[in-house]
UniProtKB/Swiss-Prot annotation:
Cellular component annotations (GO), alphabetically ordered: plasma membrane
Residues binding GTP: 1-6, 46-50, 105-108
EC number: 3.6.5.2
Catalytic activity annotation: GTP + H2O = GDP + phosphate + H(+)
Keyword Cell membrane among UniProt keywords: yes
Entry-annotated residues carrying Cysteine methyl ester: 175
Removed propeptide positions: 176-178
Family: Belongs to the small GTPase superfamily. Ras family.
GO molecular function, one term: GTP binding
Enzyme class: hydrolase
Topology in the lipid bilayer: Lipid-anchor
Protein name per UniProt: Ras-like protein
Lineage: Eukaryota, Metazoa, Ecdysozoa, Arthropoda, Crustacea
């Protein structure tokens, strides 16, 4: 908890930074965006980082199509926890490859506990993109979410599935933030 998952989501949806920390249980957001010339409806599930809500994790991992694995650059433990989240997602989805993006948040802070070259190396080992973000300055926020959408689309093309299309013909994509 406290890595800035909600702040990233609110920055994407409402274009402002939430300073106070109010632990999330679960919040859901919808946002229509145009990515690579295509209109997509993002279904974003902002999840609980607190350990006491870990029982809910399997459920939202089952329904999510792609995942932002968020750690705070000033919190080494949050980075170390990423591996367990990734393994849990793969287990729940019963798949070796699931669309994910590693996100290093709070990049505006001068003090870092996580070396970005280390984060890039972990992302490379996992075969997933890495994006540096700051919910405070909005740096990389769109990039993080849009990169995940591209990963979901790539995965669907590989599997030969076309996205579910809503009544309006927009693609609907379910993203979860861990």
């Amino acid at each position: 908890g406290g890595v800035g998952k909600s702040a990233l989501t609110i920055q994407l949806i409402q274009n402002h930074f939430v300073d106070e920390y109010d632990p999330t249980i679960e919040d859901s957001y919808r946002q229509q965006v145009v990515i690579d010339g295509e209109t997509c409806l993002l279904d974003i599930l902002d999840t609980a980082g607190q350990e006491e809500y870990s029982a809910m994790r399997d459920q939202y991992m089952r329904t999510g199509e792609g995942f932002l694995l968020v750690f705070a650059v000033n919190n080494a433990k949050s980075f170390e926890d990423i591996s367990a989240y990734r393994e849990q997602i793969k287990r729940v989805k019963d798949a070796e490859e699931v669309p994910m993006v590693l996100v290093g948040n709070k990049c505006d802070l001068p003090t870092r506990a996580v070396d970005m070259s280390q984060a890039r190396e972990v992302a490379r080992q996992y075969g997933i993109p890495f994006v540096e973000t700051s919910a405070k300055t909005r740096m990389g926020v769109d990039d993080g979410f849009y990169t995940l959408v591209r990963e979901i689309k790539k995965d669907k093309m590989k599997k030969g599935n076309s996205s579910r299309r809503g009544r309006s013909g927009r693609k609907q994509l379910k993203c979860s933030i861990l």
